[in-house]
Amino acid sequence: MSASHILNSIIAGSDMAWNQDKQRLLVQGEILVETRSHKAWGGAVTAWMYVPMVRSQVWQQLTDYPRWVQYFPDITKSEVIHRGEAKRLYQAAQKAFLFFTAQVEIYLNVVEVLGQQIQFRMEKGTFEDFDAHLELKDCGNGTLLAYTVQATPNIPIPSIFIQQAMNFELPANMRKMRQVLCKAQ
């Protein structure tokens, strides 16, 4: 199956106009991002990234949840608090804004579909809502990773600012994630 066919199947649910140039950029290392609004004070984003590693290796590292502090610099703690069929995670993060630093924490229910996807749903935390989804697909000799997040903070920040922050920060975080994943190879 060609990388182009796989890319088209992954992005079929997206509103983004995909073409050969965007697909080529993705395989060459670009992070492609699509933001959208989510409630009045929230935002949603999907980022796509190609990782030049086989899916089983990527999966093994992504499901090592304490390592997420290496992937996302704002995450200060990531720990599994319950193992089993349904995992529970605790994550804490700190983000500096213009004149203040926001500290957040979240308890997540995690559902894994072995080697294919990870779903994170907020159980409780300092968000009004939070939902994230990671999907992995084979793509040539590597893996295509799609990461979707939708969140609404407890503090009223206009949606446009949340979307801009997601659009700016998620690609940098994804590059860091790819760097850490490939370094461990």
Where are the predicted features?
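Short, well-ordered alpha-helical segments
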Residues: 57-64, 168-172, 176
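Beta-strand/loop substructures that line and gate deep hydrophobic ligand-binding cavities in soluble
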Residues: 121-168, 172
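Generic detector of well-ordered alpha-helical segments enriched in charged/polar residues
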Residues: 8, 23, 162-163, 167, ...
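Hydrophobic ligand-binding cavity/cleft-lining segments
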Residues: 1-84
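Hydrophobic residues positioned within well-ordered beta-strands of beta-sheet architectures
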Residues: 19-21, 45-47, 89-90, 106-108, ...
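Glycine-rich portal/gate segments that line the openings of hydrophobic small-molecule binding cavities
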Residues: 4, 36-41, 50, 69-124, ...
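Short loop segments at secondary-structure junctions
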Residues: 53-55, 113-115, 139-140
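Membrane-targeting and insertion segments and their boundary/processing signals
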Residues: 28-45, 103-106, 140-151
